[in-house]
């Protein structure tokens, strides 16, 4: 149990997808204007990561990995296309559910919802799972932890952005300039977790 808690804390704080690896920056910067929208996208990314990583782990371990199906057969060259297909399918399901049950969030996310399918944070989570050879329970913990870490980062940035609307920011830094500075400072803060040994 201690191993899984350690893996979860590592995924959320120490190896944060957005602030340690800078993955998923397109949607991270574009949807961080309002906390409510950022929270909705964070939930969506957490859902997709939390399901895509374990599902892809099962497919990789039982089908694609060397000697998984037949002795001497290695289908790992199909990793990318398989992982992307699973992620795209999950995003389509999520899009249909949000359109049916949460139309306001669906409309607020707009074009960025389908872009989750090509969000490099999600593909990065799946790739790290393969690279680190996580088993199924570890992949569940890692997937949800990575998603929650990304959500924590985007909600924190959205909160800062909302506060900065009322701040006296120099004209040259308004918009993306101050956002990049804020993200850099947040990343420095998250770097302090890198010295923690779990």
Curated annotation (Swiss-Prot):
Membrane topology according to the record: Multi-pass membrane protein
Disulfide bonds: none
Entry keyword Thylakoid: no
Protein localization: Cell inner membrane
Record-linked Pfam families: Rnf-Nqr
TM region positions: 11-31, 35-55, 77-97, 110-130, 140-160, 176-196
Keywords from the UniProt entry: Cell inner membrane, Cell membrane, Ion transport, Membrane, NAD, Sodium, Sodium transport, Translocase, Transmembrane, Transmembrane helix, Transport, Ubiquinone
GO CC annotations, alphabetized: Gram-negative-bacterium-type cell wall; plasma membrane
Superkingdom of this protein's organism: Bacteria
One MF annotation (Gene Ontology) recorded for this entry: oxidoreductase activity, acting on NAD(P)H, quinone or similar compound as acceptor
Catalytic activity annotation: a ubiquinone + n Na(+)(in) + NADH + H(+) = a ubiquinol + n Na(+)(out) + NAD(+)
GO BP annotations, alphabetical order: respiratory electron transport chain; sodium ion transport
Annotated EC: 7.2.1.1
Family the UniProt entry places it in: Belongs to the NqrDE/RnfAE family.
HAMAP family, A to Z: NqrE (MF_00429)
Record's function text: NQR complex catalyzes the reduction of ubiquinone-1 to ubiquinol by two successive reactions, coupled with the transport of Na(+) ions from the cytoplasm to the periplasm. NqrA to NqrE are probably involved in the second step, the conversion of ubisemiquinone to ubiquinol.
Record note on quaternary structure: Composed of six subunits; NqrA, NqrB, NqrC, NqrD, NqrE and NqrF.
Protein name: Na(+)-translocating NADH-quinone reductase subunit E
Organism: Haemophilus influenzae (strain PittEE)
Gene: nqrE
């Amino acid at each position: 149990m201690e191993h899984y808690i350690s893996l979860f804390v590592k995924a959320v704080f120490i190896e944060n997808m957005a602030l340690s690896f800078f993955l998923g920056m397109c949607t991270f910067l574009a949807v961080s204007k309002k906390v409510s929208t950022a929270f909705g996208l964070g939930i969506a990314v957490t859902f997709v990561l939390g399901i895509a990583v374990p599902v892809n782990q099962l497919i990789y371990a039982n089908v694609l990995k060397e000697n998984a199906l037949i002795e001497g057969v290695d289908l790992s060259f199909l990793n990318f296309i398989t992982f992307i297909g699973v992620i795209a399918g999950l995003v389509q399901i999520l899009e249909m559910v949000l359109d049916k049950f949460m139309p306001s969030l669906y409309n607020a996310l707009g074009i960025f919802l389908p872009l989750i399918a090509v969000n490099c944070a999600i593909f990065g989570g799946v790739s790290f799972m393969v690279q680190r050879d996580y088993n199924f329970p570890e992949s569940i913990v890692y997937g949800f932890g990575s998603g929650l870490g990304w959500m924590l980062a985007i909600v924190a940035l959205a909160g800062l952005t909302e506060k900065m609307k009322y701040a006296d920011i120099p004209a040259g830094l308004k918009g993306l300039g101050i956002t990049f500075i804020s993200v850099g400072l947040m990343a420095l803060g998250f770097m302090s977790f890198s010295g923690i040994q779990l």
